[in-house]
């Protein structure tokens, strides 16, 4: 009996040690795999696509990035993308696309002064400068907007599942859920349709 008990103890101890070793190896391997594919949580990382087919990795860019038909596009020290309207020669209908990968986030200031904080796995399409009587952007994913007040030019966010319209306010738009747009209002008023 004593030998049988020792053999059982040895068997179960060896099995537990092997399982623990396999679990530790799997965790290490999967962690390395995830880190190589995705940005770290909260990392200021995004790619900017412009009309001429060029793309810019915003994590590796210096302050000044390029001119968009006379409008200076640059990053400030906080890695925030800005469209400088002071240098704008003319209204520009060119559209840019900001693509934020999994685990990343990125902030930008649009030409009208609206601040946008785009979250992970988000895509924002917007004009270099707003023309006409509306300020329109297109969002897939999630972003926080601090809209510059302009009663004559409403700010409109198009999502795959609806439209959000405001004049000047602070709100969050989330389209991660399938067939659903969630709007969280921090201040002001919005119309959702």
Residue ranges of predicted features:
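Disordered, charged N-terminal biogenesis/targeting segments of membrane/secreted proteins
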Residues: 1-5
